[in-house]
């Protein structure tokens, strides 16, 4: 993964700076180890990225963050070195079941250095778009939507 993606953990934030609801004063989603954990006044990242949860029982889960957001130390921001479709990157990273690389401790966690060593095939961009299109078409069939 490390030859295709740059992975950087976010920054610590005091719990007192988090709001449970999105307001005019706290408009930015804050990503933790299992997706959005609240909203904050100031972002620490901007763009369109896969986010990997790196701490807790659900570590290895993949979310997508778009726009301005805050990533905590329990979330890994994934940037693509190659010209990759972000939706494909999210699907692909999810399919890797990254939780299998978690440390087996009381509080499971992923080390960026460990998952960076995972070898992966990368299809051409056109194939990535085709995969995403097929997934979008089939997803409602398995989610009963």
Ranges and model annotations:
Residues 26, 67-68, 99:
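Intrinsically disordered, low-complexity segments enriched in small/polar residues
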Residues 4-7, 92, 101:
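Residues that form generic nucleotide/phosphate-binding pockets
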Residues 32-94, 103-115:
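A short beta-sheet element
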Residues 22-23, 43, 99:
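Generic hydrophobic-segment detector
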Residues 1-15, 20-34, 117, 121-145:
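Non-catalytic DNA-recognition/assembly elements of restriction-modification systems
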Residues 96-100, 139-141:
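A common structural junction motif
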């Amino acid at each position: 993964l490390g030859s295709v993606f740059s992975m950087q953990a976010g920054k610590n934030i005091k719990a007192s700076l988090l709001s449970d609801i999105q307001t005019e004063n706290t408009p930015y989603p804050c990503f933790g180890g299992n997706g959005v954990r609240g909203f904050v006044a100031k972002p620490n990242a901007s763009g369109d990225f896969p986010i990997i949860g790196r701490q807790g029982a659900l570590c290895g889960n993949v979310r997508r963050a778009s726009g301005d957001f805050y990533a905590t130390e329990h979330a890994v921001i994934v940037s693509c070195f190659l010209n990759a479709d972000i939706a494909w990157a999210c699907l692909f990273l999810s399919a890797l079941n990254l939780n299998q690389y978690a440390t087996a401790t009381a509080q499971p966690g992923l080390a960026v250095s460990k998952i960076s060593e995972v070898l992966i095939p990368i299809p051409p961009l056109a194939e990535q778009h085709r995969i995403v299109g097929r997934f979008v078409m089939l997803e409602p069939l398995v989610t009963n939507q």
